Amino acid sequence: MKLEISAKRSQESIRAYALRIIHKNLLKMNLVPGMALSEQEIANELHISRTPVREAFIRLAHENILVILPQRGTYVEKIALEQVAESMFLRTTMESEVMKLACHSFPTRNIDQLEACLELQRISLKQKDYPRFFEQDGIFHGSIFAACGKHRIWQMIEQASLNYNRLRMMNLANDGENEMPMLFKHHKEMLTAIKQRDIEAGRILIKEHVGKVFSNLDDLKLQYPSYFKGGTEDTLI
């Protein structure tokens, strides 16, 4: 097991640090569905005790991201497509309303922020750096929420969207050369809609953009049948 590890943040507790690193590696598919996890191995990689890792496991199990089986171990939960659909509904509903607010009134300084974010996305696209593009994608959407005074709602959406985001990451990893240009185009058009105060165009774009998560699902299920819940693959082990 090899985790992508970043430094502990100032004022961040050991427990929060362990949770953040594990969550990030689940999202980036370094910890894949069905994988067995070891408290001790992760603790060793993070140079911390097992207790905060165990606490992170319990928290993630409560969120249906990990499965803890007594006497057997802890495993990464498979991607539940029903949960992906629920997250897509949540995002489409909330982002459409926030886009309406953004098209009605949006501060100039925040326009500049979105344009800077698009420039970073353009660089990631050119470098074919899909993890960085994914990160900037989230910053772009989160910045729109923040500019409309809805930052906490975006945080709640992100907390409820791990399965949705894992599938998005798989799409980028599997077909980034097609996915990234299309997503980048959507973002540019969203910014144009905000500038032109075109609510209808903005809401149509949101629906298309968020719903794109299912565009390559059949191919992904063929390549990685053990990663998804449903059908004959419904058993974890």
What are these model-predicted stretches?
Residues 13, 111-112, 178-182:
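Short helix-capping and inter-helix turn/linker motifs at the boundaries of alpha-helical repeat units
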